[in-house]
């Protein structure tokens, strides 16, 4: 199930720092990447992952993420570097409505493996029937 996770923030008059450690995550961090310089009209993602879970946070800017479990879709608005969205494996993800200057940080519990991606929505619906 998707859930919001509050990240640890530290700060004083010099500025703020957000820390992400394995002990604070619902999984062990194996991969980290970020999406940036994305046009507002672009849709990123459009896939599901059989084995990878993810944590999404906008370290600057804002975007929306639609999560689909094969039966229902829910859209989340990310606009705080102090809050992250956890998305378990097996769900369809679409990231869109990127505000100019957005940097979307993504943490995963698996290294990249192209063979675990489901990029066809019809195939995803079949996957949900067999694994739901």
Model segments located where?
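Beta-rich strand-turn-strand
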Residues: 92-96
